[in-house]
UniProtKB/Swiss-Prot annotation:
This protein's encoding gene: fhs
GO molecular function: ATP binding; formate-tetrahydrofolate ligase activity
SUPFAM superfamilies for the chain: P-loop containing nucleoside triphosphate hydrolases (SSF52540)
Enzyme class at the top of the EC tree: ligase
Domain of life the protein comes from: Bacteria
Protein name per Swiss-Prot or TrEMBL: Formate--tetrahydrofolate ligase
PROSITE patterns: FTHFS_1, FTHFS_2
Protein residues bound to ATP: T65, P66, A67, G68, E69, G70, K71, T72
């Protein structure tokens, strides 16, 4: 089988103006970025906002392993399959980050015959949204240090500056640096940390904003640090929000592209799901619901992270409600959760599969029992999967009261997802008992405890002294009703990435709590979460090249 980029380069793309016709958009509704990419103009939303909403389908997954789950691939394949059975569908995805593309992951636009295209352009600079977020973030950072240099009228304590600079690249050397070393005219020396752009508060703020005016207001709410007296200093105190919103003016417009089978796709926004809330923009999701009968969206990593944050943060703050959930699982990954080594995954092992299925069952239970949503399991098929393994996994899922459907969308595109699409169409008509994992009125501490015990399976939560102090401080400052965003390893339900499967008999430790006031949530940090990744021993960048005539190779 051809590589992903080779398949993408051989695709027959339609002009984006023709793709837009499928969802009722004309050339005047688009701002073109070449022949195959466009932003949707501002005037479209007022015209369609009174349209009835389509059905919202959330695609999530088991806890990820190095064996790969293919959540984006299934999301794209399901959208293509919906089109094949005559449904008007739009796919709503996040934009990929440059850092992982050149690091360990490679490209992130689906795989095989279920990709969004132009794949190389989406994975690289796309329409410039990530660069705009980086610029807006670093403008605020520059204004903070300029304020210190120009006399510090606000009394901002350089030791308590919480807002960090960002770069959309994996660069461990920037995790901890000292700035302002240029002498008298070089600013105030202080320690600084860089984060990767998808981890930034500005990215989360963009993705949860309802429109440009709301985005500007939210930018002004960002807490950049604290005064010597402990009072919060916000971006609006530095008069930064107007310039930040100006830099983000184009970035808030949804990006329209297509799949290999010409199904429309909104690819917009890109916060990480282990550090941030892991969902595409509210703006793009809302617009898609007004233009399609079915909107298929995904949330990052496993259902304990992406799906929980999609529901408890994105849905809570926006009013969106999913109609059904697809939980993606692979037999390879479940065998790894069952204790099998990566090198042994190609051989049949029913015992390892049965042990590892506990991970899937906990995710499935969370979706159906905690959140009250109808769900189907999509078995993302790999060539080494045996009929006995598939039969066992189907039986285990049926025992749990759900249905498992094989999705062969990597190899067959939309044709390989027709059974899944038909099942989803049935699911969205089932009774929906949607609910959150916690209530707005719960204390911040209780919210964290409910997610840990109800979703992760923890026995309880331990808070460091500093985390407990910050929780009380945030509640006194008016953050008590905010949702919580728990920053946790994606590889385990627990805060220990080595505890695979569905661990029991453990407690979650919250070591730090910080406000993300622009986004509107409170972040609780657990374990060893890196906000600036590093490159691996052999970065993907070493295999990426471009020919003399401009053809890219090696990008996944």
């Amino acid at each position: 089988m051809l590589s992903d980029i080779a398949i993408a380069q051989r695709a027959r793309l339609e002009p984006i103006t023709k793709v837009a016709e499928q969802i009722g958009l004309g050339p005047e509704d688009l701002e073109l970025y070449g022949r195959y990419k466009a932003k949707v103009a501002d005037h479209v939303w007022p015209r369609v906002r009174s349209n009835p909403d389509g059905k919202l389908i959330l695609v999530t997954a088991i806890s990820p392993t190095p064996a790969g789950e293919g959540k984006t691939t299934v999301t794209v394949g399901l959208g293509q399959a919906m089109s094949r059975i005559g449904k008007r569908a739009i796919i709503a995805l996040r934009e990929p980050s440059l850092g992982p593309a050149f690091g360990v992951k490679g490209g992130a636009a689906g795989g095989g015959y279920s990709q969004v295209v132009p794949m190389d352009e989406i994975n690289l600079h796309f329409t410039g949204d990530f660069h705009a977020v980086t610029a807006a973030n670093n403008l605020l950072a520059a204004m903070i240090d300029n304020h210190l240099h120009q006399g510090n009228k606000l009394g901002l304590d350089p030791r308590q500056i919480t807002f960090k600079r960002v770069l959309d690249m994996n660069d461990r050397a920037l995790r901890s640096v000292v700035i302002g070393l240029g002498g008298k005219n070089g600013g105030v020396p202080r320690q600084e940390e860089f984060m990767i752009t998808p981890a930034s508060e500005v990215m989360a703020t963009l993705c949860l904003a309802e429109d440009l005016a709301d985005l500007k207001r939210r930018c002004g709410e960002i807490i950049v640090g604290y005064t010597y007296d402990g009072a919060p200093v916000r971006a609006r105190d530095l008069k930064a929000e107007g310039a930040m919103a100006t830099l983000l003016k184009e970035a808030i417009k949804p990006n329209l592209v297509q799949t290999l089978e010409n199904t429309p796709a909104f690819v917009h926004g890109g916060p990480f799901a282990n550090i941030a809330h892991g969902c595409n923009t509210v703006v793009a999701t809302r617009l898609a619901l007004k233009l399609a009968d079915y909107v298929i969206t995904e949330a990052g990593f496993g259902a304990d992270l992406g799906a929980e944050k999609f529901i408890d943060i994105k849905c809570r703050l926006s009013g969106l409600r999913p109609d059904a959930v697809v939980v993606v699982a692979t037999i390879r990954s479940l065998k790894m959760h069952g204790g099998l080594k990566k090198d042994d995954l190609a051989r049949e092992d029913l015992e390892a599969l049965q042990r590892g299925s506990a991970n899937l069952m906990r995710h499935l239970r969370n979706v159906t029992e905690v959140f009250g949503l109808p769900a189907v399991v999509a078995i993302n098929r790999f060539a080494a999967d045996t009929e006995a393994e598939i039969a066992l996994l189907r039986a285990l899922v049926e025992e749990a009261g759900a249905t498992a459907v094989v999705a062969d969308v990597h190899a067959r595109g939309g044709d390989g997802g027709i059974e899944l699409a038909q099942r989803v169409v049935e699911l969205v008509e089932q009774p929906n008992r949607f609910r959150f994992a916690y209530d707005d009125e719960d204390s911040l501490k209780t919210k964290i405890e409910k997610v840990a015990t109800r979703i992760y399976g923890a026995d309880g939560v331990d808070f460091t002294r500093e985390a407990s102090r910050m929780l009380k401080k945030l509640e006194s400052e008016g953050f008590g009703r905010a949702p919580v965003c728990i920053a946790k390893t994606q590889y385990s339900f627990s805060d220990d990435p080595k505890k695979l499967g569905a661990p029991t008999g453990w407690r979650l430790t919250v070591r730090e709590v910080r406000p993300s006031a622009g986004a509107g949530f409170v972040v609780a940090l657990t374990g060893e979460i890196m906000t600036m990744p590093g490159l691996p021993p052999v970065p993907a960048a070493e295999s990426i090249d471009v020919s003399d005539d401009g053809e890219i190779t090696g990008l996944f």
